[in-house]
């Protein structure tokens, strides 16, 4: 399963105003309720007025954060993370108008250290919406799109790190092919890698997409042949899967007893990681370690793991939600034991 691709979108979608995916479901999950209150004329009945400290680890354009804020009490705190400078600008505007909001311009992989800098050791809920956002796709200058021309950048945080174009200038064919295969599940990775490395320059996403298109021997109907390669390069350059792994592991000590974890993913590489993480930490399994003759049993850190997908109505309204999955779980009272992880 891959991320929703641009070629699967209609022309209306490509001029899309971002809608947060699984909005009601994710916010209800992070608050530990089955559903949010129905909105009525009686405003006092429209909010849960939940107290505590919550984290939106991927602010984006703030859809999930704004709904979550509407359900929080005046003494609650919402800490929002994002790598993207544009997203951070939006987050700071929100923080200026709502004192409950604290902004961190960094990856959610820095969760523990960033919270420690605020003298926060534990929180009541963690929420993340993984992958690329629609505004990032729709902005050709960011380099994520193979339907709009722009620089071959693909960095989530344009203020730091190496762009895809810079990486392509120096990477060898074999390493590139391995990246396309591992992070894009591209079966024709070697053929595509050779074609990419024969390019004179890497200054146009449309030119890069065309080279991949020509090199790709099998076109899948309804899917641009560059979809998986673009996904792979973006995931690699941003260390997305490594950040997800770090975030998930940090969620164990960071969540209070009864705290909620809610994570939305859009492709199988991410969803598989979340699924395996929750399975591993909700069953009290023995860790696989051949060096330990009688390894200690891993504590059961999470209970009630569930998976929820978008409704037919949401998919109809927002086709880009079709591949989304929300996984959620509740932190148990098991003490965190660091020396038997992962």
Swiss-Prot record:
InterPro entries: RsmH, SAM-dep_MeTrfase_MraW_recog, SAM-dependent_MTases_sf. GO terms for cellular component: cytoplasm. Pfam families: Methyltransf_5 (PF01795). Keywords: Cytoplasm, Methyltransferase, rRNA processing, S-adenosyl-L-methionine, Transferase. GO terms for molecular function: rRNA (cytosine-N4-)-methyltransferase activity. Residues 280-319 are annotated as: Disordered. It is found in: Cytoplasm. The keyword Thylakoid does not apply. S-adenosyl-L-methionine binds at residues 62-64, 82, 108, 129, 136. Disulfide bonds: none annotated. It catalyses: cytidine(1402) in 16S rRNA + S-adenosyl-L-methionine = N(4)-methylcytidine(1402) in 16S rRNA + S-adenosyl-L-homocysteine + H(+). Residues 297-309 have a biased composition (Basic residues). The keyword Iron-sulfur does not apply. Its EC number is 2.1.1.199. It comes from the Bacteria. GO terms for biological process: rRNA base methylation. Belongs to the methyltransferase superfamily. RsmH family. Specifically methylates the N4 position of cytidine in position 1402 (C1402) of 16S rRNA. This is Ribosomal RNA small subunit methyltransferase H. It comes from Psychrobacter cryohalolentis (strain ATCC BAA-1226 / DSM 17306 / VKM B-2378 / K5). The lineage of its organism: Bacteria, Pseudomonadati, Pseudomonadota, Gammaproteobacteria, Moraxellales.
